[in-house]
Amino acid sequence: MTGEDFKIKSGLAQMLKGGVIMDVVTPEQAKIAEKSGACAVMALESIPADMRKSGKVCRMSDPKMIKDIMNSVSIPVMAKVRIGHFVEAQIIEALEVDYIDESEVLTPADWTHHIEKDKFKVPFVCGAKDLGEALRRINEGAAMIRTKGEAGTGDVSEAVKHIRRITEEIKACQQLKSEDDIAKVAEEMRVPVSLLKDVLEKGKLPVVNFAAGGVATPADAALLMQLGCDGVFVGSGIFKSSNPVRLATAVVEATTHFDNPSKLLEVSSDLGELMGGVSIESISHASNGVRLSEIGW
């Protein structure tokens, strides 16, 4: 997290505030997302729900596929790279995407190091499930944070847990009385004292913080906005439903009018069959289940 480059990159991410970012796997889906009012799309070859089932190593998408989506819409396009895989990031940056997501949804390439994002011109998005994780990613140069949630499940509870935890930890740290106490917490979080102080003074992260992971309905999106998120990522929920066009528009409307119950009632009606999903509690380590939110450090 350094100087003017970071200000520019975090400023670009600020432009997405209040919006919805949708996962898409084809140019046709990207066009649906754009028409529905999405502020950006995430181009990837498989949505998280399908990645969960495959059991395969998940890598960055084919650059040609990403380029085809970039050529199909006028809104910003994001693409995912594996945690720690700075060469995938170099390739995606050369493709001139608008944002890169260093994502726990893909199979990590490095189990001890995240990408040094300050070395790139393109803004990075990273997931976090608590304040320390968010600040470590920001210190590496992330211009945007999202809750990890539990991607591909349609179960919003992990995303709710993560945004509540970050908010509560900021409030708790604001109660610290001495410089020594603040320094101790910063050391425990493995971040500079100056970064933690900046958060405590502002009462929020220095970058936008979107909700992600398990968002499947307009009500889910509005819930996370009311809990303090700056916007919403929607992955598997849209195109695993029976009426993606209607649902995509409804989620955008709910994100915009998140504090208007009458509008939320209107956009939540007659949506067709929603994503079936998988409950968080059914993903057990005993049965070799993998919780994607636990990937990262």
From Swiss-Prot:
Changing R164A: No pyridoxal 5'-phosphate synthesis activity. Retains ability to isomerize dihydroxyacetone phosphate to glyceraldehyde 3-phosphate. This is Pyridoxal 5'-phosphate synthase subunit SNZ1. CDD domains: pdxS (cd04727). One of its GO terms (cellular component) is glutaminase complex. The active site is at K80. One of its GO terms (biological process) is glutamine catabolic process. Keywords: Lyase, Pyridoxal phosphate, Schiff base. The gene is SNZ1. Pathway: Cofactor biosynthesis; pyridoxal 5'-phosphate biosynthesis. InterPro entries: Aldolase_TIM, PdxS/SNZ, PdxS/SNZ_N, RibuloseP-bd_barrel.
